[in-house]
Amino acid sequence: MRVVAFAPALSAAEQNGGGVNAKGFPMTSCFVDNFPAQITVPMVIALCALGGADYDPVKYIVATSPEGERVGSLEFSWHWHDNPPTPVKFRVFTQYLPMRVSAAGVYSIGLYDSLHQADTEYLYPLPVLKTNPLLANR
């Protein structure tokens, strides 16, 4: 299985006919009114695989604070049928990651095969900042 895209969006929704409708993708920063805050981050994940494999994948999205503390996670899985006669299959998801942000900083959001996996090549840095009230009406 190969990850084609993994990033947050300002908003994202799966379409009935397949695909995702996303705005603000990729999201390059997140603003909150106050700390601490509980936020939900729409994540877009696109994958492909060869037919004949990866029928019931399970993935985990984990958010960590700038200090490395886990501040949110979710598990998602699906049954992935082959698409004959095409030798490859594609899937795109929108997952909504709940996370607690306690202070401004760069949070990390990673895609993992297990909740206990230490490292991943799919890691997205997300700066979380406090909203500047002087710029709120711009």
Q: Which sequence ranges carry the predicted segments?
A:
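Contiguous segments within soluble domain cores/interaction surfaces
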Residues: 2-104, 108-138
